[in-house]
Regions:
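Short gly/ser-rich loop at a beta-strand->alpha-helix junction or flexible surface loop bordering the NTP-binding
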Residues: 1-68, 75, 79-80, 84-108
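Structured mid-to-C-terminal alpha-helical surface segments
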Residues: 100-124
């Protein structure tokens, strides 16, 4: 595939779904995010997303903005999304990446979300 997150970001795309969050550090906080877990969803349901498939191939659907990883993670934690995907992503992160999420949360007055029992082992 060869694309990196910054390449997609320059194109104005948001990457979504478990693989994109883990591999690229970018994702969407839109309500349609759960659709990005599936390879066979019709394109009209994905309007505005970049779908990264499990096999590494991708489909770009235009018209989205990008979010840096700390913002994407905080946004995900606020929405009703698959907690296991978030935990899986946090498990893959370095201490510096976890710290960047903490810093972003403090700067944006979102520290309260980090105190949630679901994330306590990471931000405790």
């Amino acid at each position: 595939m060869g694309w990196k997150a910054d390449g997609f970001a320059r194109m104005g795309c948001v990457l979504g779904g478990r693989d994109a969050l883990n591999v690229y550090g970018y994702c969407s906080s839109d309500n349609y995010m759960t659709f990005l877990e599936f390879e066979d969803v019709k394109e009209e349901l994905l309007r505005g997303f970049c779908l990264i498939k499990g096999d590494g191939s991708y489909n770009i659907v235009d018209g989205v903005k990008c979010s840096p990883m700390p913002k994407a993670m905080i946004d995900l934690m606020k929405f009703d999304y698959d907690d296991s995907a978030i935990n899986e992503s946090l498990d893959c992160m370095t201490d510096e990446e976890i710290e960047s999420i903490k810093e972003y949360a403090e700067k944006t007055n979102n520290s309260k979300i980090l105190k949630d029992k679901r994330w306590s082992e990471y931000f405790g």
